[in-house]
């Protein structure tokens, strides 16, 4: 067996120790998340060019400029230096990251989908689309990787927070020497806010007792309004405003997604009214279309009868439209669906009726998410800020969820509690008219997940297949992105996030 010579081994260990010491010395260095807006802003400016020349922005917090000692004997003759204040540069863009939940490659209509997504499509027609943007196969890892620019294992988020363990890389506890986008931008002069789903804090740290060191405000978002876990009841959510649990209105028309959009709009307006020269960063993450699929009936009615043809026909229709739009090569072959997914024509009439209803509610939920996202985008346009706002619209944090198993669930919790009646067809048909209402907590049959992940085979959780890890992305920035509706097939990953950066810079 080959053995490393003693001297070489000693030198290797010295180098390793040296690297460890270097890492320790730089524990407060922020992760350079490879987002285009960081490069474009050149990390900002401050009061006066003379100060800027003395500022080192490779380490955060930014240290103030050095001033020579004031030796004037008479204080009346002494001249005070200018007040140091870290500011983003003039015309630095606002930044908005939109991340939907549990929807895959065949979701938006711009990517061949059969569900209406007008806001995504509008941005796509005016911006740059990516058809090879990759996420991880699960919620928490994707979100942590996106915000830190680290491999999700390096950020201790190897799996979702609910099943975190004490094994290295899987604790669900962000290391103290890993920074987030919120911290990086806030320390460079941005106002920062996060709305909606978080799902990045270990479950034993999300009670009102804390500890709060890995909550959104400590990562460091000035404002947070949302839920900390992987899902919540959209009619009666568990919501936190910053560190405080809040009671939502006792209103039959209340829906969290509408509420979070309104909160984001109000914050943007308030921030701009007080500090119009200060750019902002908003992370907007609806709970849709993660179960429970809760949505008002007015949205469901739009899709009545739209899925009666079944998942096989819908899957093929999405596939053909994808080829027509050019988001997949024209010679692409539709992958075989999993063997466990029955052909639609082999299902009973009862099964077809129930499953079609499940898809109608799912589609309505996605449509609502896109609509509420559009409300936030509209306020940017109304304020004259849209042209200089860099928007990343990420259509899903992984593939579409097949966690509704073969028959779907009227109440997702029946599955987790091993209640067999929860997936019984006759039992669930009792809730046909109520599907999506406050009396249900529903999920859909796995066959629909396969259809909405066309042209791939698998779905969320299957990291070895693109159906789980490839998601549509649109980058929109009218002031700097000149291409309109262009499609890029450059490979990109949620931790790098700067494919074809020359097109943005």
Give the label of every model feature segment:
Residues 42, 50-505:
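Formylglycine-dependent sulfatase
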Residues 32-42:
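Bacterial N-terminal signal peptides
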Residues 9, 22-23, 35-37, 51, ...:
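Intrinsic disorder/low-complexity segments
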Residues 5, 9, 13-34:
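Bacterial N-terminal signal peptides that target proteins for export
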């Amino acid at each position: 067996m080959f053995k490393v010579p003693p001297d070489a081994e000693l030198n290797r260990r010295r180098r390793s120790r040296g690297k460890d010491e270097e890492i320790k010395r730089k524990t407060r260095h922020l992760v350079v998340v490879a987002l285009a807006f960081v490069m474009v802003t050149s990390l900002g400016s401050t009061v006066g060019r003379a100060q800027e020349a003395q500022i080192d922005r490779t380490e955060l917090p930014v240290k103030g400029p050095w001033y020579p000692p004031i030796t004037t004997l008479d204080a009346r003759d002494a001249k005070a230096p200018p007040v140091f204040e870290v500011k983003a540069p003039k015309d630095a863009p606002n930044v908005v990251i939109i991340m939907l939940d549990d929807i895959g490659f065949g979701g938006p209509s711009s990517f061949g989908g059969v569900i209406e997504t007008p806001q995504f499509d509008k941005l796509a027609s005016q911006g740059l689309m990516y058809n090879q943007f990759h996420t991880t196969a699960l919620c928490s890892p994707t979100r942590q990787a996106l915000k830190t620019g680290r491999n999700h294992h390096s950020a201790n988020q190897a799996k979702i927070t609910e099943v975190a363990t004490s094994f290295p890389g899987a604790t669900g506890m962000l290391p103290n020497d890993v920074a987030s986008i919120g911290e990086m931008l806030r320390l460079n002069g941005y106002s920062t806010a996060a709305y909606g789903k978080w799902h990045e804090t270990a479950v034993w740290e999300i009670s009102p007792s804390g500890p709060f060191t890995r909550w959104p405000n400590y990562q460091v978002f000035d404002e947070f309004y949302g839920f900390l876990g992987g899902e919540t009841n959209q009619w009666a959510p568990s919501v936190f405003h910053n560190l405080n649990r809040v009671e939502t209105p006792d209103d039959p028309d209340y829906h969290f997604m509408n509420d979070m959009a309104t909160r984001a709009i109000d914050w943007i307006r308030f921030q701009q009214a007080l500090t119009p020269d200060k750019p902002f960063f908003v992370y907007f993450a609806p709970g849709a279309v993660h179960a429970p699929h809760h949505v008002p009936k007015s949205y469901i009615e739009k899709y009545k009868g739209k899925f009666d043809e079944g998942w096989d026909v819908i899957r093929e229709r999405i596939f053909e439209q994808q080829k027509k739009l050019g988001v997949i090569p024209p010679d692409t072959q539709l992958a075989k669906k999993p063997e466990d997914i029955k052909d639609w024509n082999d299902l009973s009439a009862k099964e077809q009726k129930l499953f079609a209803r499940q898809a109608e509610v799912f589609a309505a939920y996605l449509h609502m998410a896109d609509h509420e996202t559009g409300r936030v985008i509209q306020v940017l346009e109304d304020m004259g800020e849209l042209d200089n706002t860099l928007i990343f619209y990420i259509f899903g944090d992984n593939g579409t969820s097949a966690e509704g198993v073969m028959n779907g669930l009227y109440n997702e919790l029946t599955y987790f509690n091993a209640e067999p009646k929860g997936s019984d067809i006759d039992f669930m048909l009792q809730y046909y008219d109520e599907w999506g209402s406050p009396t249900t907590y529903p999920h859909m049959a796995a066959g629909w997940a396969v259809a909405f992940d066309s042209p791939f085979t698998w779905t969320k959780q299957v990291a070895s297949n693109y159906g789980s890890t490839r998601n549509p992305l649109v980058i929109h920035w009218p002031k700097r992105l000149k291409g309109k509706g262009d499609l890029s097939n450059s490979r990109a990953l949620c931790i790098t996030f700067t494919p074809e950066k020359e097109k943005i810079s």
